[in-house]
Amino acid sequence: NIFISDKIVSSEVVNFKKGARIFTISVKDPERYGVIKLLNNIPVEIVEKPKEFISNNAVTGLYFYDTEATSLCKKLKPSNRNELEITDLNKVYLKNEMLSVSSLGESETWMDAGTFESLLDAGNYIAALQKRLGRLVGSPELTSYNQGFLSKSDLLEFIKNAPNNSYYQLLKSSIT
């Protein structure tokens, strides 16, 4: 999953207190995703890749959990794939009436990257956006620098030792 937004995390983290919060977006093909059914904006059901229509609200894969999540995960049973499923954790919060839902707005972009085709589409979209804007989109190094987790000298040293390619050239031009 790939998200592009300037404000989604900062505003939601500030307001998040207890329980779990999941993010949704309306899609035209809900059978490809986990979806959530809402009644009066209250979550009532989560279904992974529903065969019959229940909702267009796809669960995007962006979640916030409180400190109870770890202990709740320890109680989950592995799925048929022998994995603990995030949907099952969300269902526990739903059952306990501790699940809240936020919808992504029109200024936020979500791209599924769960298939080869959707990953390629997402990569091409970001490449085109970077080319048009002339700046990096979604760079973890640049975000770390802008948030004060990396100093300019540390980032420049990192770039100096990195491969010489357009990504690192653009990263360097973003901070100099």
Predicted regions and their residues:
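Conserved beta-loop-beta/alpha segment of the NTase-like Rossmann-fold superfamily
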Residues: 1-40, 64-67, 71-76
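Catalytic-core segments of class I nucleotidyltransferases/pyrophosphorylases
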Residues: 13-14, 42-149, 153-154, 160
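Short, amphipathic C-terminal "tail helix"
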Residues: 149-150, 155-176
